[in-house]
Amino acid sequence: MFNAGNWLLLIFTGCMVLIINGCSTGSWRESSRESAQIAPNPTITREAVIHVYSADAWGWRGLFAVHTWISVKPSNADSYTVLEVIGWRERHGLPVLRIEEDIPDRYWFGSKPELILEKRGEGVDELIDKIIEASQYYPWANTYKVFPGPNSNTFPAWIALKVPELKLELPFRAFGSGWAE
């Protein structure tokens, strides 16, 4: 029969197993950042595309939280622009908000992204313009705090508030998304 001490040991052991399994044995530097092959090829797909992705955070944080980002491709563009917040940039004196031409659907340091929103075709160019315009006024472009925010999930949540016709809903595990409200 289990007594209180045995229950505590069982709970502690279970938590340790979860944490250990959530921690990668490798370095984030060695983790995949390749395309997950979710986004349509921009040289073939001529229509406008908006994708919002979510992927488990790095290491043990991935047990609880996700990283979210936005990728856009205007009509007839040959590449995607990725809009995301990356916290380590702050330590290097860079804005945490990164808006650059990049692979739209990269693995997030080993975690395969999940497509949480897709908009394509007619009217999407106008939405892209609104996203880009709103991003210029993001109030925390140089500020990052893992918890409670502002963090990587605050930016897409803020865009969702500024561009409501996007109809973006972030996953429950997007901690920091409430900071934008």
PLM features per residue range, with description:
Residues 101-135, 139-142, 159, 163:
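A cross-kingdom signal targeting lumenal/periplasmic-facing segments of multi-pass membrane
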Residues 10, 56, 142-143:
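A general structural-boundary detector
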Residues 1-12:
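N-terminal Sec-pathway targeting helices
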Residues 19-22:
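C-terminal motif of bacterial Sec signal peptides marking the signal peptidase cleavage site
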Residues 26-39, 43-118:
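Glycine-rich catalytic cores of cysteine/serine-nucleophile enzymes that process amide/ester linkages
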